[in-house]
Amino acid sequence: MNKRRWIAVGVACGLLLLSIIVALIPGKDKEEASNTTLTGINKIFYGSNEITEETLEEGASNKKIVKLSVNGVIADTGESNLFSREQYNHQNFLTQLKKIQEDKAVKGVLLEVNSPGGGIYESAEIAKEMAKIKKLDIPIYTAFKNTAASGGYYISAGSDKIFATEETTTGSIGVIISGLNYSGLLEKLGVTDATYKSGALKDMMSPQHKPSEEENKVIQEFVMSAYDRFVNVVAKGRNMDTNAVKELADGRIYDGNQAVENGLVDQIGYSEDALDSLKKEKKLTDATVIEYKNDTTGFASSWLGNKIAEWQGLKATTSDRVISVFEKLGFSDTPKPMYYYGGL
C-alpha cells in the first residue's frame, strides 16, 4: 500500500473515531463537542495556522529585521492562509504587520514587493499599518522585484528607502474602473432595458444602457478623488511636491532607472542590497533576520487534504475561488476602482 493510501486510511479512521465519540454524547452538547473534536483533528492534520518565526540569519535576539513579502494581486479573497492557493493572502499579511508593531525586538523591516497592485481599500489598509510601524521608529527598506506598480507602489511609497532593479516595472500611479457595456448589442437583438430606479444615477455603469454625460462626470470625479489620495500618498512618502507627482502620475510605467531619475526609487539594487543597506545605515549588522511562516503540516496542499477541507467548508472550491478573484478585481456586476496595472 503506497503512502497516499496509508494517509487516506488514517483520515478515514480519524473520521470514524470522531463519529463514534460524537454519537455517544447526549443532546445539546453534541454539536459543541463535534466542533471541538473536529478542530483538534484538523490541527493534527493541517497544523494550527499560527504565525511562527523562521530565522534566515542568526544574530542578536534583541534585534530583529523582519522580511515581508507582497507577491501577487493585492486583494482580500477571504480565505484562510492555511487553505489559500493565492500567492498573496491579505488578512495574513495584515496580521504580520500588526505582529511587528507588538514585538519590541523588531528594529527594521525589509519589504519585498512583486505586485501589479489591486484594490484601493486593501492598498490603503496596508499603507495604514505600515505608517504605524514607522511611527514606532522602525525603518522600512523596500525592494521591488519584477513588478511593483500602481497599488504595489502605493504601499511602498512611505518606505525609508526603495530599491529596484533596472528590469523592474513600476509606476502606473493612478486609478482605473473597468466594465463592459453591451447596450448596443441588446439594441440590435431587440432587448429593452426595464430598470426602475429612485434616481437618475442609481444604476451608474450599468452595462445595459449608454452612460449619460452626467454619469460620466460623476464616475470621473469619483476616480479622481481616489487618484488625489494616491498622489498625496506618494508626495508625502517621497517628500515631493504634489504637482511634481502629478506630472509622473498619468498611469505610465517606468523601469528601475527611469524611476530613480524621477525620484520614485532611491537606488538600483536587489533584495540583498536593500538588506545590506538597512543593516549598515541603521546599525543593525548584528541583527537576526527572520520571516513569518504559518504553522502547517503541508497536508492542505495535497489532493486528499484539499477535498476534506472543501467537505468541511474550511476551503473554497476551485469555482468559488475563481468567482471570488473575479469579484475582487471588478469582474462582477459592480465595477470597482483599482490601483492596478495592466487593465482589467
Swiss-Prot record:
Predominant location: membrane
Bilayer topology term: Single-pass membrane protein
Gene3D superfamilies assigned: 2-enoyl-CoA Hydratase, Chain A, domain 1
Domain of life where this protein originates: Bacteria
InterPro entries in alphabetical order: ClpP/crotonase-like_dom_sf, Pept_S49_SppA, Peptidase_S49, S49_SppA_C
Enzyme class, broadest EC rank: hydrolase
Pfam family membership, one: Peptidase_S49
Biological process (GO), any one: proteolysis
Residue ranges of the TM segments: 6-26
Enzyme Commission number, as recorded: 3.4.21.-
Compartment(s): Cell membrane
Keywords, comma-separated and alphabetical: Cell membrane, Hydrolase, Membrane, Protease, Serine protease, Transmembrane, Transmembrane helix
Keyword Ligase: no
SUPFAM superfamilies per the UniProt record, alphabetical: ClpP/crotonase
GO cellular component, one term: plasma membrane
GO MF, one annotated term: serine-type peptidase activity
Protein family according to the UniProt entry: Belongs to the peptidase S49 family.
Functional summary from the UniProt entry: Digestion of the cleaved signal peptides.
PANTHER family to which the protein is assigned, alphabetical: PEPTIDASE S49, SIGNAL PEPTIDE PEPTIDASE SPPA-RELATED
Protein name per the record: Putative signal peptide peptidase SppA
Organism: Enterococcus faecium (Streptococcus faecium)
Lineage: Bacteria, Bacillati, Bacillota, Bacilli, Lactobacillales
